[in-house]
């Protein structure tokens, strides 16, 4: 059974809200009219495609998670972003899942989920990771037809409610015209939305409104972000505490960026090697001794070499001794699957792009960037980087039809607005990125706040050893190390695409939620 509701508005106010909404609709003030190619100085066309600024559709569902029946509702809709003058400047599209076969969800954990980009919709984790429905793919994550969705038997909806948020210009979220009908200029839009700190600021306001409307202030709250979404949620942790007075229980960083923690020079170059080794192992390009080891037995050996031998050698640059250079060169070649000549020509600093092109060059294949299990075919075997990203083209095969079908046909959200898998958010202001320090400070201020990092061993864009390095550097005092954890998976950037890792990563989330929930009556306090 499906129904449309004024979701989040108390019943005794719904009649007044309905009248108010009708009036606004009559005056055309509640409808965003956007033309696909409208420019900053054009008036909005009378024949533009329409999306409502503030609406919701609720559908009721039932599924099985870990073998047990779970009833839930799915709310799809839009909620405005207001400026300081209380004028709507954007509307964000979201999907909100609530378990309905529980007596009271006001104290149930709430997961607020963001993807990255910047400029990416929330589609990836929504229909492939934590949501109750996931796209049709095979057990390793490759697309299959017919496209569509299926039950996610490992979804965390059994233990937490989830809202998937699409930032401005992603999904169905859009910038709104000004009062005179013209769109804000590109510069105005960037100041409001498209930058590290602007993004954090408006999303914190939006989250506050969402939590208030849906009566979730008493719920333990968690942020989960993937890729650039980890920059977003790291900054949001402090912004929510200091500007919205909303304190969290946990932050989950999936395939994290550097979150403003610099790793340049020798560290940046050396940190790639463990990822090179994992990928070479996967493609059977290591010698028999290394290839016969399990991946999790091999990687600690490579990590130890990286920290204790490779970084010191790179730090010495052109002054490294010939003997030390030969030793390091031989070990790098052994662990990476690349030739000593190729590594030497790059002065021990091999780029990921070259690795993707060179590892299987003799077979005429290239490697995927976000997931190096995927293979591509270039026009020429020569060159220093692949022609295209094999994994991304593969993913778009299945994700694009799945989300468009699912929202319209199963969740009953119908609009002619295009669903932006990737939206126009550039140029993105990356200045003053202190999100790692923001997360550290949020943890220091909030003894309840825990952080978990999840990363795939075959991710070449945000590699797993960089993720470990970020965790190590996040709190150099070591005083909060018991609230920081790392989980690795035998897949890539979206580790949950591999069926075994979908199961394990969701279980890791369940454990993280359970362990970050303080015992009843336990105070948020540091003890001597």
Region spans (language model):
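N-terminal cap/lid subdomain of alpha/beta-hydrolase-fold enzymes
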Residues: 37-45, 86-189, 472
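A catalytic-pocket lid/entrance helix-loop region that shapes and gates access to the active site
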Residues: 131-136, 237, 241-334
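Alpha/beta-hydrolase active-site loop
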Residues: 157-160, 167, 191-212
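Alpha/beta-hydrolase fold nucleophile elbow
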Residues: 216-228
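Glycine-rich nucleophile elbow surrounding the catalytic serine of serine-hydrolase chemistry
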Residues: 225-238
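Short alpha-helix in the alpha/beta-hydrolase fold that links the catalytic acid
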Residues: 449, 463-473
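Catalytic histidine-centered segment of alpha/beta-hydrolase-like enzymes
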Residues: 490-501
């Amino acid at each position: 059974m499906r129904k449309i509701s004024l979701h989040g508005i108390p019943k005794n106010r719904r009649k007044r809200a309905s009248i108010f909404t009708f009036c606004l609709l009559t005056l055309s003030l509640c409808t965003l009219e956007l033309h696909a190619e409208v420019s900053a100085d054009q008036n909005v066309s009378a024949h533009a495609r329409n999306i409502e600024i503030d609406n919701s559709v609720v559908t009721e569902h039932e599924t099985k998670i870990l073998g047990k029946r779970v009833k839930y509702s799915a709310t799809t809709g839009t909620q405005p972003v207001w400026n300081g003058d209380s004028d709507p400047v954007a509307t964000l599209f979201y999907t909100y899942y609530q378990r309905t076969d529980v007596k009271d969800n006001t104290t149930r954990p709430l997961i607020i989920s963001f993807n990255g980009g910047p400029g990416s919709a929330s589609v990836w984790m929504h229909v492939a990771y934590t949501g109750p429905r996931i796209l049709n793919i095979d057990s390793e994550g490759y697309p299959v037809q017919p496209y569509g969705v299926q039950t996610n038997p490992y979804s965390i909806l059994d233990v937490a409610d989830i809202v998937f948020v699409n930032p401005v210009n992603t999904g169905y979220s859009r910038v709104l015209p000004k009062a005179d009908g013209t769109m804000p200029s590109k510069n105005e839009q960037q100041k409001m939305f498209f930058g590290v700190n602007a993004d954090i600021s408006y999303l914190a306001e939006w989250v506050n409104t969402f939590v208030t409307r849906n009566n979730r202030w008493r719920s333990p709250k968690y942020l989960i972000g993937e890729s650039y979404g980890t920059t977003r949620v790291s900054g949001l942790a402090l912004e929510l505490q200091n500007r919205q007075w909303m304190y969290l229980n946990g932050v989950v960083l999936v395939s994290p960026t550097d979150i403003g923690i610099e790793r340049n020079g020798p560290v940046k170059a050396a940190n790639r090697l463990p990822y090179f080794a994992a990928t070479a192992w996967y493609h059977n390009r290591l010698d028999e001794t290394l290839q016969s080891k399990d991946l999790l037995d091999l990687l600690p050996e490579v990590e130890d070499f990286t920290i204790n031998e490779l970084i010191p050698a790179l730090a010495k640059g052109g002054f490294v001794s010939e003997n030390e250079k030969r030793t390091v060169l031989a070990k790098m070649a052994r662990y990476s699957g690349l030739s000593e000549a190729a590594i030497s020509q790059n002065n021990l600093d091999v780029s990921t792009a070259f690795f993707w092109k060179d590892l299987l060059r003799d077979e005429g294949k290239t490697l995927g960037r976000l997931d190096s299990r995927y293979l591509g075919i270039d026009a020429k075997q020569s060159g220093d980087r692949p022609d295209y990203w094999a994994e991304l083209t593969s993913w778009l095969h299945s994700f694009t039809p799945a989300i468009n079908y699912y929202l319209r046909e199963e969740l009953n959200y119908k609009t002619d607005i295009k669903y932006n898998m990737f939206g126009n958010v550039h140029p993105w202001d990356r200045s003053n990125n202190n999100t790692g320090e923001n997360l550290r400070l949020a943890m220091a201020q909030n003894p309840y706040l825990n952080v978990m990092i999840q990363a795939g061993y075959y991710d070449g864009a945000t590699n797993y050893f960089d993720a470990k390095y970020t965790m190590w550097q996040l709190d150099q005092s070591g005083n909060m190390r018991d609230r920081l954890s790392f989980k690795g998976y035998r897949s890539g950037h979206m580790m949950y695409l591999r069926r075994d890792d979908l199961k394990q990563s969701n279980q890791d989330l369940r454990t993280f939620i359970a362990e970050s929930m303080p015992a009843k009556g336990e105070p948020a306090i540091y003890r001597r």
